[in-house]
Amino acid sequence: MAGRSSNRSIGTVAMRWHGDRLELLDQRLLPAEEHWIVADGASAVAQCITDMVVRGAPAIGISAAYGVALAARHAGGGDWQAEIKQAIRVLAKSRPTAVNLFWALERMEKVFHACHSLDEATDRLAAEAVRLHEDDLAANLAMADYALEVMNPDKPIAVLTHCNTGALATGGYGTALGVIRRLHEEKLLKRVYADETRPWLQGSRLTAWELTRDHIPVTLNADGAAAAIMASGKVKWIVVGADRITANGDVANKIGTYNLAVLARHHKIGFMVVAPSSTVDMSLESGKDIPIEEREGTEVREIRGIPLAPAGVQVFNPVFDVTPASLIDAIVTEKGAVRNPNITGMRALFT
């Protein structure tokens, strides 16, 4: 593996656990305002996930795990098992595409079913949520190592990224943005080009904010400028995250990712997906099986109440698109990298 730098920051945290409550950094307000929302129960956590107070597949899963822990913490003395089961159901409905959500809830549910009293459930579920959070950070650090092995740069390079895959979207450090952090730590990063990522502007509001805070050189660009940047020869790799990866290596990620993969293939630029193995859903054969969330048209027609389009105009607003495995050069997880992904390579990750 690539050598690990001792000069490392895990980045700005997206959540703070206090045992009886979860604090979530309201990412809808960044970069203008840093405001923390207190979630003191599972329903409050679920609402924060739905409303995109917290976003990013790993962070959603971790938040949901803490939500289950809070359900146990605040359960009544009656049918506490029914209360926790209901909390899990509510959390499962908060975002349909991020498989990490269901993976985290299944992990918490296994612990829950092994508990024989409310006190035991309270202690064990809280400990499991913290462990899940710590495991995610460790996975991000491992993914950065594997990604650098795939890239194998012999001099500083520039990369382009999409959406936000940093500490704000994970348990710390980041997935795709964690790779960028590692390049910077090893003095192998020339510059990051960050797509603004319409319509929620995660690139401009979050990625540019994270990188600027951590003194990592970043240039913000309109989504439509990505092709021109690639054509200029400025970037060597496109590095993105994932919300769900299927058994054949197809990837669901933030809308606009598919565009980048097509452009990267045309310009002969490497296209890398970085995500924890919990994002891989081997029960789905291909990207055609992934449910794609669509959100309200107001997210495209306006920004914070300011009209950008005629009132009532029809809007197509899918949150994700699916990039075929045939356009991906490598999928990197904490278990290793799959180059030119296919079903054989994806299965090998789990053997």
UniProtKB/Swiss-Prot annotation:
Functional pathway: Amino-acid biosynthesis; L-methionine biosynthesis via salvage pathway; L-methionine from S-methyl-5-thio-alpha-D-ribose 1-phosphate: step 1/6
- Recorded E.C. number(s)? 5.3.1.23
Q: Give the GO biological process terms.
A: L-methionine salvage from methylthioadenosine
Q: Which reaction does it catalyse?
A: 5-(methylsulfanyl)-alpha-D-ribose 1-phosphate = 5-(methylsulfanyl)-D-ribulose 1-phosphate
The record places the site described as Transition state stabilizer at C163
Source organism superkingdom: Bacteria
**Which InterPro entries does the protein's record reference?**
IF-2B-related, IF-M1Pi, IF_2B-like_C, Initiation_fac_2B_a/b/d, M1Pi_N, NagB/RpiA_transferase-like
Matching entries from Gene3D superfamilies are given as: translation initiation factor eif-2b, domain 1, Translation initiation factor eif-2b, domain 2
User: What GO MF annotations does this protein's record show?
Assistant: S-methyl-5-thioribose-1-phosphate isomerase activity
Top-level enzyme category: isomerase
Q: Where does substrate bind?
A: R55, G56, A57, R95, Q202, N253, K254
Supply the alphabetized keyword list: Amino-acid biosynthesis, Isomerase, Methionine biosynthesis
Q: List the active site.
A: D243
Q: What does this protein do?
A: Catalyzes the interconversion of methylthioribose-1-phosphate (MTR-1-P) into methylthioribulose-1-phosphate (MTRu-1-P).
* PANTHER family membership: METHYLTHIORIBOSE-1-PHOSPHATE ISOMERASE
Q: State the family it belongs to.
A: Belongs to the eIF-2B alpha/beta/delta subunits family. MtnA subfamily.
Q: Which NCBIfam families match?
A: eIF-2B_rel, PRK05720.1, salvage_mtnA
**Protein name from the UniProt record:** Methylthioribose-1-phosphate isomerase
